[in-house]
């Protein structure tokens, strides 16, 4: 691989990592809004909008696994978890501060939107971490089983 190709590969990796982290953190910020989904009019599901970015994260880890390998994909997952916890700490710190009288967002509104249940978020992040690691492991299991062929199967 030429130095130019290496630089391009690194740039693509960083872009994919940034998209992964942005999707993960965004899902944690928007999870409190819900909508109804009625596939084919058969059943009505009440779903958090926080689920919308999730498929993007799994697609990105599959792309990273295919191109950069299991180790690099796992590194992005761990970086995403750290970014999520860090953003939660910032939000909690912001929630503990007192808004000034003429603030466009008062304390109650801010807390209602961003006042996270730390235990629920922690449990969600741990479940997500395991789901991502399992996804990456299964992806590589199928890749090894098919000897790198049948990408559609993975």
Where are these regions (language model features)?
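N-terminal membrane topogenic signal
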Residues: 3-18
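Cytoplasmic-side transmembrane-helix entry/capping segments in multi-pass membrane proteins
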Residues: 13, 17, 72-82
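Alpha-helical transmembrane segments of multi-pass membrane proteins
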Residues: 21-36
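Hydrophobic alpha-helical transmembrane segments of multi-pass membrane proteins
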Residues: 48-52, 122-129
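Central hydrophobic cores of alpha-helical transmembrane segments in multi-pass inner-membrane proteins
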Residues: 52-63
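Transmembrane alpha-helix/helix-exit interface in multi-pass inner-membrane proteins
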Residues: 84-103, 124, 128, 132
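Membrane-interface interhelical connector segments
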Residues: 94-119
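Internal alpha-helical transmembrane segments of multi-pass membrane proteins
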Residues: 146-154
